[in-house]
Amino acid sequence: MAAVSRDLLERLYAAPPDGFVAARSAAVAEARAAGDAAGAREIGKLRKPTVAAWLVNLLALRRPDLMAELVELSAALRAAQRELRGARLRELSARRRDLVATLVAQARALAEASYPDVPVGRLPLTEVEATLQAALSDVEIAEQVRSGRLVRAVSYAGFGEVPRPQLRLVT
């Protein structure tokens, strides 16, 4: 996707989903008018995000500091799980709950501040929370979330890293 500028991607994925198709069509027309047929095709392939994905994209694009903290925390959680450190897991789990709650509140605030016409009371914040929890559990999902180009919410139903740590009986 080298033909599509980062600025354009950020502009499209930070805008509310109801305006995505019109903005994408305008960008395609602009690229065609500039003689960039390959760029126009690439822009035309971009998928419209769901409202939940848009909220996560807002976090990634406008609060990269908090998203970096999420990724750091996910690495710490995986390490504590791999090393079977119960006390550390409990501490990190409390931090996880606080950070996810902060991120969900930030998503709501960003939507409300940036786009006053968005019905804040009907935002799918549970899907946002599920996506953030999935990002904590899976490295690939975390990278998708951090990209700011998510097109749909994600959930995770696993039990930790695969392969699981080798357990041994201590007598």
What is each stretch, according to the model?
Residues 23-65, 78-85, 91:
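N-terminal interaction modules that seed assembly of large macromolecular complexes
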Residues 4-5, 51, 73:
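N-terminal alpha-helical segment
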Residues 11-19, 43, 61:
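A short N-terminal beta->alpha junction/helix N-cap motif
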Residues 1-15, 22, 32, 165-171:
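Actinobacteria-biased recognition of intrinsically disordered, low-complexity terminal regions
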Residues 8, 59, 65-171:
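Amphipathic alpha-helical coiled-coil/helical-stalk segments
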